[in-house]
């Protein structure tokens, strides 16, 4: 009877699927970026505590604070406590991804708390709290 042309249907399906596909790619990028920033903050704190424990007699709170701030951009909160044989670092950072930039909100907040001790000239560094909050 009628000879139907399916090219229009394919075009409509393509136009409907492209935004969904782009949204999925953007979400994957945002999550990967948040994981990268979490690892960067966590590793920087760990290295700063390791360095501080190596130089426990000479290091000051301000030097460790400056070391962390110079290696991690956009910290919201940082607290460094240096005691006799113990260093505690608490830091927080907000990560804004592509979706957050489009809609003006922070997608994730990363909190890292580490504690390092010298026990019989042996270093022990432990993670106290590691929190990754997603705010939608």
Regions found by a protein language model. Name each.
Residues 55-136:
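Short, conserved structural patches
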